[in-house]
């Protein structure tokens, strides 16, 4: 499971011209589900993302998490994070989980954030073309992989 985590002042997502999710200060999370991912991957990434200390404290040091500041999350599914571009010029998405499995794990990821941490969150729409507007704060962008590839 892969995530691109961006610290944002504001972020929202539109589907077919309609706003379906919006947050203020917090994290924009683009989430890709890999074939073979499961509950352990969800647990690892949710815990890592919610407790990642990338918000500034009173001294300007990155020392606070989204949980510490009472921030929000916008979680958007993005299978293209699993694209392999090592050969040729067209990404290969063979490592991405099937849509059925990816949707199930995506929903479990969202539920875990809400249930275990009680954070306010919004989501995109699975398997839909989305327009995402992100107002980066910093910018601060972190790449995470549950298999700890980077």
Curated annotation (Swiss-Prot):
InterPro entries: Daa-tRNA_deacyls_DTD, DTD-like_sf. One of its GO terms (molecular function) is Ser(Gly)-tRNA(Ala) hydrolase activity. Keywords: Cytoplasm, Hydrolase, RNA-binding, tRNA-binding. It catalyses: glycyl-tRNA(Ala) + H2O = tRNA(Ala) + glycine + H(+); a D-aminoacyl-tRNA + H2O = a tRNA + a D-alpha-amino acid + H(+). It is found in: Cytoplasm. One of its GO terms (cellular component) is cytoplasm. Its EC number is 3.1.1.96. It holds the Pfam family Tyr_Deacylase. The keyword Hydrolase applies. A motif (Gly-cisPro motif, important for rejection of L-amino acids) lies at residues 138-139. GO terms for biological process: D-amino acid catabolic process. Homodimer. A Gly-cisPro motif from one monomer fits into the active site of the other monomer to allow specific chiral rejection of L-amino acids. An aminoacyl-tRNA editing enzyme that deacylates mischarged D-aminoacyl-tRNAs. Also deacylates mischarged glycyl-tRNA(Ala), protecting cells against glycine mischarging by AlaRS. Acts via tRNA-based rather than protein-based catalysis; rejects L-amino acids rather than detecting D-amino acids in the active site. By recycling D-aminoacyl-tRNA to D-amino acids and free tRNA molecules, this enzyme counteracts the toxicity associated with the formation of D-aminoacyl-tRNA entities in vivo and helps enforce protein L-homochirality. Belongs to the DTD family. HAMAP family: Deacylase_Dtd (MF_00518). This is D-aminoacyl-tRNA deacylase.
């Amino acid at each position: 499971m892969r995530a691109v985590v961006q610290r944002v002042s504001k972020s929202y997502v539109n589907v077919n011209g309609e706003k379906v999710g919006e947050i203020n200060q917090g994290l924009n999370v683009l989430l890709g589900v890999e074939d073979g991912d499961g509950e352990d991957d969800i647990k690892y990434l949710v815990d890592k993302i919610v407790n990642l200390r990338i918000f500034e404290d009173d001294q300007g040091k990155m020392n606070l998490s989204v949980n510490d500041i009472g921030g929000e999350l916008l979680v958007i599914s993005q299978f293209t994070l699993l694209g392999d571009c090592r050969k040729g010029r067209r990404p290969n998405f063979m490592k991405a989980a099937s849509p059925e499995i990816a949707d199930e794990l995506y929903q479990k990821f969202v539920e875990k954030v809400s249930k275990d941490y009680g954070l306010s969150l919004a989501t995109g729409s699975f398997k839909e073309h989305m327009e995402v507007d992100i107002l980066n704060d910093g910018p601060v962008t972190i790449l995470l992989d549950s298999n700890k590839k980077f």
